[in-house]
Amino acid sequence: MPDPATYRPAPGSIPVEPGVYRFRDPHGRVIYVGKAKSLRSRLTSYFADITSLAPRTRQMVMTAGSVEWTVVTTEVEALQLEYNWIKEFDPRFNVRYRDDKSYPVLAVTLNEEYPRLMVYRGPRRKGVRYFGPYSHAWAIRETLDLLTRVFPARTCSAGVFKRHKQIDRPCLLGYIDKCSAPCVGRVSAEQHRQIVLDFCDFLGGKTDRLAKDMEQQMTAAAEQLDFERAARLRDDISALKRALEKQAVVFGDGTDADVVAFADDDLEAAVQVFHVRGGRVRGQRGWIVEKSSEPAATGDADLGQSGQEQLVEQFLTQFYGEQAELGSASDTGGDEATNPVPRQVLVPVLPPNADELATWLSGLRGSRVSLRVPVRGDKRALAETVQRNAQEALAQHKLKRAGDFNARSEALQSIQEALGLADAPLRIECVDISHVQGTDVVASLVVFEDGLPRKSDYRHYAIREAAGDGRSDDVASIAEVTRRRFLRHTSDSQPDPSAEQRPRRFAYPPNLFVVDGGAPQVNAAAAVLEDLGVDDVAVIGLAKRLEEVWVPSEPDPVILPRNSEGLYLLQRVRDEAHRFAISYHRSKRSKRMTASALDSVRGLGEHRRKALVAHFGSVARLKEATVDEITAVPGIGVATARAVQEALGVAPQNGTAPDPAPGTGDPQTPADPHSAATAADIEDDRHATGATGPQMNGSEQQVDRV
């Protein structure tokens, strides 16, 4: 582990202006990004007394190998640069609020002819309005179940809508009047869009007008003795009231605000946000994050921040920066209810740079944003409610963490002691091979960090050299995967620490590399690492049945106690690698078993393959077809037709006159079928017939994701 004294900059060389700084590890990867009103005061405080730093901050300083900085002119500029760098480099020691793709929202696809209401997770899209986020998907479905009685808009997928349109019969929701059934023409596209717009107005807070309109319609229907319609409107009004009861009014003045609260301990913090739009709570979300405290120092206001002030600043910059980007990709329709940055943000404390934060948020919103601490009235009462939610979330997490964290720490320490490692194996990678009698030989690589799976770093491999033609060599396969994995690591390494490049997924080498197998497998992996010059990664093998831990060049295995937490962790890692390898093997085998002879035709994409089979009914009938019959299929030219016949092993038919052979002027000399269907000819076919651009078939897709 690097010594901070080896890279500590001289205090006189650090500027006193505001700026943004980056800590890098010995491999040159950015591990932490921060900003400061005075770079000299902030950076000096990191090295003044290492023991006084917070545990996570101390670990960061001990892990780093260099520090660099960029001077800016204003704190607003520093906020923006800090946010951009955190997003670009994804530093491992920065707090990240990652939930934008996991929290569900209610999406309304206004960009379609018949807009649809649906539960959605993922990046925002143009032409779609979003309401939420909701804490659970069932909350959205419950809302839809209530409101589709009043606003019978379409909720089905495009495939279901198309199928019912073809059979001219509505789905069950159409029969029970929870859908206006535009698929069968019960309402026109304009009428259905108006239903959807009324639905959006209701969720946007325009509830009083809709309720009054429905009451007037109910009264008019009763006066006209249309009691059936009046009763239906009465039930619809009741449904609206029930929906409104679920969104109680918290601000009588119709305020749009986000109410933020924190509860923290020495290691972690719970964050809770209530989204209030139109005076009603429209959504709620929460996080549990690891604290990354800045060191305190004297003589600089922004270094005297409390833990809560730092949490507020980190949350505002990261959360609203992400939300503004998501909102810019969606269609908010100018509706205040769906604006990702509200007029007010209510926080428990104001950080020293509150004015700069408010200016930055105003720039994201496009109008003034007020950053305030509620002190009385309804806003103070709601802030206390959010605070209680944060405290409850942290208490529940600590109960779970107490068991999980202690067990994981004990497991890592047990492995370290049993294998004689210098440090605990915080990052463990495991390789497993999967095949059936030498066919579809694949490998998996799974990653565990701090004893927990990191699925974003999982990889699978199609074995290229050590398998094929029904043969399989597990030892050679392990060696191949090890070589490919660590070749990627060495190629990703940045010799120049100043290189401006975001680290890839495998920028960090593992502390422990586990292979599924015994002495032969682990010795093969160790030999590869030695060839590549990788000497800072420990390698072991975990043999099945007896659960023996094999170490390279050792005649006897290491036996961990059966009740050892370290053995349990290694088993979980091995079993996860086994599961991931089997799932990929099954997928690959399924694709092979359902492969068609047409897959090998170069330039013939999936759509044209399906068109051929649909036209002739089967590949057997396609074999019997002439070139003229094949070219009758839209998008298929003569060259492609001949390539199809060649792939199917069919001799050239006389259904059409052959082209002259290249280089001869004799039109009666038949061209070589291999030269007739070149890739260029097939490409010409596609352009000549108006077919779509080149498509990659299944056999040409890159299987190896690494």
From Swiss-Prot:
Function in brief: The UvrABC repair system catalyzes the recognition and processing of DNA lesions. UvrC both incises the 5' and 3' sides of the lesion. The N-terminal half is responsible for the 3' incision and the C-terminal half is responsible for the 5' incision.
Subunit-structure text: Interacts with UvrB in an incision complex.
Highest taxon of the lineage: Bacteria
Gene3D superfamilies assigned: 5' to 3' exonuclease, C-terminal subdomain, GIY-YIG endonuclease, UVR domain, UvrC, RNAse H endonuclease domain
One CC-aspect GO term: excinuclease repair complex
Family: Belongs to the UvrC family.
Gene Ontology molecular function, alphabetical: DNA binding; excinuclease ABC activity
PROSITE patterns per the UniProt record, alphabetical: GIY_YIG, UVR, UVRC
Compartment(s) where it occurs, according to its Swiss-Prot or TrEMBL record: Cytoplasm
Biased composition (Polar residues): 692-706
Name under which the protein is recorded: UvrABC system protein C
Keywords assigned by UniProt, alphabetized: Cytoplasm, DNA damage, DNA excision, DNA repair, Excision nuclease, SOS response
Every UVR domain range: 208-243
Cross-referenced InterPro entries: GIY-YIG_endonuc, GIY-YIG_endonuc_sf, GIY-YIG_UvrC_Cho, RuvA_2-like, UVR_dom, UVR_dom_sf, UvrABC_protein_C, UvrC
GIY-YIG domain mapped to chain residues: 16-95
A Gene Ontology biological process term: nucleotide-excision repair
Region Disordered, residue ranges: 651-706
